[in-house]
């Protein structure tokens, strides 16, 4: 979801704005309302980096081979902020909690399914 700030700068998402990132990482500007998107080399570089991001570029082998990873949600901007400005970083400190939640959901769904069918 594209976001625009009071100066007319365009961001790929509100989470990439300076107001969301604070001092943790530089804002990621992809253009402005006056000149458009990708009108200079810096914006073009940002867009190329974002287009290249996927689960494989942001994940370690541990994440890729995780049996829960298929349903694992992640926010590119949060990962960018957590790393201090690297779009190919993935925050993994919540993995244990996500795995526990996913396994609990499976357990209770299966239990419900067995009781109702």
Predicted regions located by residue number:
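Glycine-centered flexibility sites
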Residues: 8, 31, 74-75
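A C-terminal junction/extension of Radical SAM enzymes
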Residues: 1-19
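Short Fe-S-cluster ligation motifs
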Residues: 90-117
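Active-site lining segments that contact anionic ligands and/or coordinate catalytic metals
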Residues: 1, 5-7, 25, 58-63, ...
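Local cysteine-cluster metal-coordination motifs and their immediate loop/turn environment
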Residues: 12-15, 59-79, 97
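Short cysteine/histidine-rich zinc-coordinating motifs and their immediately flanking basic loops
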Residues: 75-88, 106-110
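C-terminal accessory region of radical SAM enzymes
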Residues: 16-65
């Amino acid at each position: 979801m594209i976001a625009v700030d009071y100066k007319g700068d365009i961001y790929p998402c509100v989470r990439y704005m300076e107001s969301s990132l604070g001092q943790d990482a530089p804002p990621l500007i992809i253009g402005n309302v006056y000149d458009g998107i990708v009108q200079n080399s810096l914006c073009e570089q940002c867009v190329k980096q974002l287009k290249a991001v996927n689960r494989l570029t942001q994940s370690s082998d541990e994440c890729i081979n995780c049996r829960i990873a298929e349903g694992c949600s992640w926010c590119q901007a949060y990962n960018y902020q957590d790393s201090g400005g690297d779009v190919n970083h993935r925050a993994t400190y919540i993995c244990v909690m996500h795995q526990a939640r996913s396994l609990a959901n499976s357990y209770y769904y299966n239990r419900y399914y067995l009781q109702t069918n």
